[in-house]
């Protein structure tokens, strides 16, 4: 959402797509949010009220190739849009549509399969939609970091103190 607001604020036409997988998975696993977070539609309305700028919202599953293709060929149905017409073929797609692989995928093989299916199919569907409809569209793909193995040390999580080549710092690992 912050990325969408950033580009909207800088004058770009923005469409955000979500299937609420993460929200639903948190509910399923009884690890709900720390505080209530508005839906994408609610956030888009609040954004427009405060800035006068529109962020279109489409709710759907990007593992469904036809839904993905609808975002490129004009068949998309927006859950929120001030002007309901097709936003047009995107110049840039920032692909965040991967679910965090761990710890969700480590629960059991079923959850691991859901993670793999989601993360591979979304990327595959995006590649074919761009190939078939929008070869000039640029893709920026951001995914989760997952590393597996048995190093001869603990795999730390949280704030780490580090000394390296005479410099010291503190940083959050594995995400910063």
PLM region descriptions:
Residues 1-176:
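N-terminal Rossmann-like NAD(P)+-binding domain of SDR-like oxidoreductases, especially those catalyzing
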């Amino acid at each position: 959402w912050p990325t969408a607001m950033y580009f909207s604020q800088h004058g770009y036409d923005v469409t955000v797509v979500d299937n609420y997988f993460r929200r639903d998975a948190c509910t399923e696993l009884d690890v709900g949010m720390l505080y209530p977070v508005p839906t994408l539609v609610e956030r888009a309305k609040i954004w427009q009220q405060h800035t006068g700028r529109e962020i279109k919202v489409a709710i759907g599953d990007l593992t469904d190739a036809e839904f993905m293709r609808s975002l490129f060929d004009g068949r998309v149905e927006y859950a929120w849009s001030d002007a309901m017409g097709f936003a047009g073929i995107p110049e840039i797609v920032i692909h965040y549509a991967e679910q965090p692989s761990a710890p969700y995928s480590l629960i059991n093989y079923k959850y691991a399969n859901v993670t793999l299916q989601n993360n591979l199919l979304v990327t595959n569907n995006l590649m074919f939609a761009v190939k078939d409809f929008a070869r000039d569209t640029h893709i920026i793909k951001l995914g989760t970091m997952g590393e597996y193995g048995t190093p001869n040390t603990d795999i730390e999580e949280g704030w780490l103190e580090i000394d390296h080549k005479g410099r010291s710092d503190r940083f959050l690992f594995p995400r910063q």
